[in-house]
Amino acid sequence: MALIIQKFGGTSVANIDRIKKIAPIIKAEIAKNNQVIVVVSAMAGVTNQLVTLCNEVSSLNNISQFAEYDVALSSGEIVTASLLALALQEEDIKAQSFLAWQLPILTDNNHSKALVESITTDLLEKYLQLNTVPIIAGFQGTNKSNRLTTLGRGGSDTTAALIAAAMKAKRCDIYTDVEGIFTADPRIIPNAKKIKEIDFLEMLELASSGAKVLHPRAVELVMRYKIDMRVLSTFSPNTEGTLITSKDKNMENGIINSITSNKNLLKISVKSISLSFLQVANMITQNNNHIEFMQEIKNNEEYSFITNLTDENNLQALLTNLKNDKQIQDFTFDAEIATISLIGYGIKNDCKVLEMILSKLTKDNINVNMIQLSEVKITLLINDQDAEKTIFNLYNLFKIS
């Protein structure tokens, strides 16, 4: 008997009809003599609605306000967990919903982007022994002050991976509205191919570069704890998805396996005389604000940072306070940027790969603002209006399949 974690995303639970259709998927896994723990997201669109409501009543610029923001946002997953438990009970499957504080899932105090410190599994183990399917509300935790916290966007993926690690599960299955991971976005590249199997590290780079199927925190966790993960379609449950696992690779051959883009970015330009480049960077990274790129433009005068667009409210409040305190002279935001990332082992050491990219972009009059290289990824920072054209041309250049 194996333990399988099943996570269902927002589109999979978007309405009552879809929630009812999840029951046979869970039932089929139990029929294989496996134990199942389910993690759910909020219904599609609900979290965005809750964010809008919070923004209508609050400026969200202090810790107390973000604590209440977390309470509001977490309600979406709570509703889904209870509805799915009811749907399973109607199918004569014993099920019970669980919230983060009941286990508990203990986090730090960073409201809206908390990091998980520990998970107590006693309650989950007890209910599994009673042949009951635990339905966990994803995206949420609780801190040592007994205040509810949230894990940031994509947090339900993270919850599923954390539960898989804590429970030493055999596998973590992510059910979504697509049939797996593709070599490129099928909306841009209609002939993009589904990847049957992908290495943990390649998937991590793909997820962190804008591929929206999985959150990079979840991939990092299953990689760290060596737990296989599958990406499957709720709407075609019998279709083979993508397996994320350890696999052999040849580091010497520079082969592009996939390409992705990310427009969910924000460029911050900061002018400061009193604060150094590293001091400003350190302040930005507080409260788990993530920096993708950073650059000192003028010595001790002007700095540039690329962060997630979702951090805009936090950073607006931080930089406004610094400006009011005269620690910085000015700052500007620019959201009209995008990254294009090409993923594949050995591409950093194969000079021909970067040469081909730069030659093609020069020919196409695409302006590249920054380039970032790792062993398995080349990332280009460009203007967002050039993103789709660049993906299409580079996909065809490298004949990705």
Curated annotation (Swiss-Prot):
Keywords: Amino-acid biosynthesis, ATP-binding, Diaminopimelate biosynthesis, Kinase, Lysine biosynthesis, Nucleotide-binding, Transferase. Pathway: Amino-acid biosynthesis; L-lysine biosynthesis via DAP pathway; (S)-tetrahydrodipicolinate from L-aspartate: step 1/4; Amino-acid biosynthesis; L-methionine biosynthesis via de novo pathway; L-homoserine from L-aspartate: step 1/3; Amino-acid biosynthesis; L-threonine biosynthesis; L-threonine from L-aspartate: step 1/5. Pfam families: AA_kinase, ACT_9. It catalyses: L-aspartate + ATP = 4-phospho-L-aspartate + ADP. One of its GO terms (molecular function) is aspartate kinase activity. Its EC number is 2.7.2.4. PROSITE patterns: ASPARTOKINASE. InterPro entries: AceGlu_kinase-like_sf (IPR036393), ACT-like_dom_sf (IPR045865), ACT_Aspartokinase (IPR054352), AKii-LysC-BS (IPR041740), Asp/Glu/Uridylate_kinase (IPR001048), Asp_kin_monofn (IPR005260), Asp_kinase (IPR001341), Aspartate_kinase_CS (IPR018042). GO terms for biological process: diaminopimelate biosynthetic process; homoserine biosynthetic process; lysine biosynthetic process via diaminopimelate; threonine biosynthetic process. It is an enzyme of class 2 (transferase). Transmembrane segments: none annotated. CDD domains: AAK_AKii-LysC-BS. GO terms for cellular component: cytosol. Belongs to the aspartokinase family. This is Aspartokinase. The lineage of its organism: Bacteria, Pseudomonadati, Pseudomonadota, Alphaproteobacteria, Rickettsiales.
